[in-house]
Swiss-Prot record:
Required for respiratory activity and maintenance and expression of the mitochondrial genome. Keywords: Mitochondrion. Belongs to the RRG8 family. One of its GO terms (biological process) is mitochondrial genome maintenance. Transmembrane segments: none annotated. This is Required for respiratory growth protein 8, mitochondrial. The gene is RRG8. It is found in: Mitochondrion. It comes from Saccharomyces cerevisiae (strain RM11-1a) (Baker's yeast). The lineage of its organism: Eukaryota, Fungi, Dikarya, Ascomycota, Saccharomycotina. The keyword Mitochondrion applies.
Length: 277
C-alpha cells in the first residue's frame, strides 16, 4: 500500500529546517601546501620578523648579545649566497663578488658578443654577479674552471667561446683593488686612539704572529674589554706598513668599529684572502 501524494510532498518539501546543515552551501577554503608546508618542501626555515627587536628583548627578558656592535657578528649576519667553487652557501661578506662586464679587445673597444668575469670589492644589483671563496690559494687552484663561475643565467644564454676569465690577472687585480682602497682610506682617516671601546688596532709586525687576533685589555678604571688586532705586516706591503707605523707613540692605528665599518670589512677581507689555508 503506497503513501498518499500529500505524504510525499510533506517529506520532500516541508522538511524541518532543524535537520538541514546551514553551512553545507559554504565552500571549504583551499589550503595550499605552498603555505602550510613551505619550510618542508623548500628546505627553508621559518623566519620570525619583529617590528621592534629591542622591545621584544626587554619585554620577554631575553639575553641581548649586542651583535650589532660586534664586528664578526655583522659579517656573519650578511645574507647567505651560494659560491661557485664549493657549491655551498656562505655569508656574502666572506666571499669575493664577481661581476659580468663586456669584454674589451686590444683596441679597448667593448665586444658585445663576449663577456668577461672580473672580481669586484662590493656587491651591486646593477650588474649580474656571482661569488667565489675569499681565498687566494683556493682561487688559484680552481682557475682552470673559472668559466663555470659565471652566473647561471649567463651560462644558459651564452656559448663557452663568448665567456672570458683572465686567469693571469684575476688574483693580482683583486688584491691590487683591495690595497688601493685601504691605502686611500687609511691616508685620510683619523686615529681614534685607545679611547674607543669598540675598536680595532692595526699593527705591523713581521714576526710569526697571527694576521687577526682578539685581545683582552684593560680600559678606563681597569675594566677589561676586547679588541681586534689586524697585523698588516702579514701583507708585505711597504706603503701600508709606512702608514701604520708612522705614529711611534701608539705603535699602530686605532679604528672605531662603529664608524669605520667599511674600511674594517675590507681589511678583514684582505687578510682573509692572503691567509694560508
Amino acid at each position: 500500500m503506497g503513501l498518499p501524494k500529500s505524504a510525499y510532498k510533506k517529506l520532500l518539501i516541508d522538511c524541518p529546517t532543524r535537520v538541514i546543515n546551514k553551512n553545507c552551501a559554504q565552500r571549504v577554503k583551499d589550503v595550499s601546501p605552498l603555505i602550510t608546508n613551505f619550510e618542508k618542501w623548500s628546505d627553508k626555515r621559518k623566519k620570525l620578523y619583529f617590528k621592534d627587536e629591542e622591545e621584544m628583548v626587554g619585554h620577554f627578558h631575553l639575553e641581548n648579545f649586542n651583535l650589532k656592535n660586534n664586528l664578526y657578528g655583522r659579517l656573519l649576519a650578511s645574507p647567505m649566497r651560494a659560491e661557485k667553487i664549493s657549491k655551498l652557501k656562505s655569508c656574502r661578506e666572506l666571499l669575493i663578488p664577481l661581476k659580468v662586464v663586456p669584454s674589451t679587445g686590444k683596441d679597448q673597444h667593448a665586444d658585445k658578443d663576449k663577456l668577461k668575469l672580473v672580481p669586484t670589492l662590493d656587491y651591486s644589483k646593477s650588474y649580474k654577479s656571482s661569488y667565489v671563496l675569499n681565498s687566494a690559494s683556493i682561487v688559484q687552484d680552481n682557475l682552470a674552471a673559472a668559466t663555470s663561475w659565471f652566473p647561471i643565467s649567463v651560462l644558459q644564454t651564452s656559448t663557452p667561446k663568448s665567456l672570458e676569465v683572465d686567469s693571469s690577472t684575476f688574483i693580482t687585480e683583486y688584491n691590487a683593488n683591495l690595497h688601493a682602497f685601504i691605502k686611500a682610506r687609511l691616508s685620510v682617516i683619523p686615529n681614534v686612539g685607545p679611547s674607543s671601546i669598540n675598536r680595532v688596532l692595526l699593527i705591523c709586525d713581521k714576526r710569526k704572529t697571527p694576521p687577526i687576533e682578539i685581545q683582552v685589555v684593560s680600559h678606563g678604571k681597569g675594566l677589561p674589554i676586547t679588541q681586534s688586532v689586524f697585523n698588516l705586516g702579514y701583507l708585505h706591503e711597504p706603503t701600508l706598513e709606512a702608514i701604520v707605523s708612522k705614529d711611534a707613540v701608539t705603535k699602530g692605528i686605532y679604528l672605531d668599529a662603529d664608524n669605520d665599518k667599511d674600511l674594517i670589512k675590507h681589511l678583514y677581507s684582505t687578510l682573509l684572502f692572503q691567509s694560508v689555508n
